[in-house]
């Protein structure tokens, strides 16, 4: 019942008063986020990988402030169609009960066919580069990566298993053992794949003292290069 109420609430027309309030809240939240190093480095990382590609586009306080209520409502009516909805249900339900629940969950959504999503182009090859951004934070936030695989790639599970050894396995990963345990450069270091409709990023991330950022970066690259050359044991 809570889920049904939530969908029905989302389907209601948005008043101008509510739109203006939520727009102002979103602009303020983004302005605050843009002061934080983790937000800055993440946005810079995606822009460096994808440039003018749709994956590289970033919202700004100005772009959010320019959005009109009618534009938001039209987008919702076009793309949030019941015919395009996917409903996942887990529990002790018969098929007929699940179908009835799915019908209740989607009946408040627009009934139009919906506009097909545009084809996202493949990103252009990315050049190797290093960007440094001055910030008064006590720690340096480091990200390393590049576009790699898209959804449905046959190598996803081999890469997932391999990355568990490299940096996705927490305290048993090579990056954690070298960067944290052996050298003490960071409390945590991670790596993961993010497949998208087009090649999404492989990313390594960590935070460290500014004074040792160069050493931490060099060690992280060394571990990555060794893993690529030799693979897991």
Explain the meaning of each model-derived region.
Residues 91-96, 209-213:
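Helix N-cap motif at beta-to-alpha junctions
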Residues 9-14, 105-113, 222-232:
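A common structural junction motif
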């Amino acid at each position: 019942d809570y889920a049904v109420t939530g969908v029905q609430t989302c389907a209601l027309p948005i008043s101008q008063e509510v739109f203006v309030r939520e727009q102002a809240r979103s602009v303020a939240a983004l302005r605050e986020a843009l002061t934080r190093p983790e937000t800055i480095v993440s946005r810079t990382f995606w822009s460096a990988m994808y440039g003018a590609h749709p994956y590289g586009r970033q919202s700004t306080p100005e772009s959010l402030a320019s959005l009109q209520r009618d534009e938001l409502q039209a987008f919702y009516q076009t793309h949030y169609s019941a015919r395009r909805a996917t409903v996942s249900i887990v529990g002790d339900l018969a098929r007929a009960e699940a179908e009835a629940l799915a019908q209740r969950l989607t009946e408040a959504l627009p009934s139009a066919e919906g506009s097909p999503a545009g084809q996202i182009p493949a990103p252009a090859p990315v050049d190797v580069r290093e960007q440094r951004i001055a910030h008064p934070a006590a720690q340096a936030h480091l990200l390393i990566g590049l576009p790699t695989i898209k959804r449905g790639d046959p190598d996803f599970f081999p890469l997932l298993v391999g990355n568990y050894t490299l940096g996705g396995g927490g305290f048993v990963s090579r990056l954690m053992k070298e960067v944290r345990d052996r050298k003490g450069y960071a409390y945590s270091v991670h790596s993961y794949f993010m497949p998208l409709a087009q090649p999404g990023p492989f990313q390594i991330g960590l935070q460290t003292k500014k004074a040792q950022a160069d050493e931490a970066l060099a060690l992280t690259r060394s571990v990555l290069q060794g893993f690529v050359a030799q693979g897991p044991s």
